Amino acid sequence: METLYENYLALPIDKGLLCLEQENPSGPYFCYPANAQPIGFEGAIMYCFLPEYGEMVFACNPESCADTYVYPLAKNFQDFIRLILACGTANPVEQIVWMDQNRFDEHRAAERKLLTAEQKAAAQRLQHEFGLLPMENPFEYVKAVQRNFDGSNIQYRDEYFDVTGLERHL
């Protein structure tokens, strides 16, 4: 049985329209975990799975406005797609980590106004193909996933510790 993620990869849509480019022309950044399995990229931001956290979806942002560079967005890929359906693209979902509810609502509304017909069509295709509904309260959902998240199992590369000055805990 194919997974939802495998079915997503097989869909003939431009994933870049969802802010999930399939290639990162910039190469790996210091904060990308060593074992990250990329889902897609939005500039320097990588959306990925980390095997030590199962089906959970993460964002890795070297220019993060939060106090961390790697943070969870969804419990699983299905919920991640539902978040994208609620927000139009992955961008507003990734921004939740440093926003309050009002700022998120303003950002999501502004981003929705900028969506192209092609972006809307890509999201509609996802919804049609998978029969999923948009996440009802994306802000609350993501904040709940991030609350009390234990990132101690993230497998950072040596470069992460060199750049941040943090000590590796073995």
Predicted feature locations:
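Core mature regions of organelle-targeted
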Residues: 102-106
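Compact, glycine/acidic-enriched structural inserts
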Residues: 59-100
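A surface-exposed partner-binding patch
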Residues: 1-65, 91-92, 98, 109-170
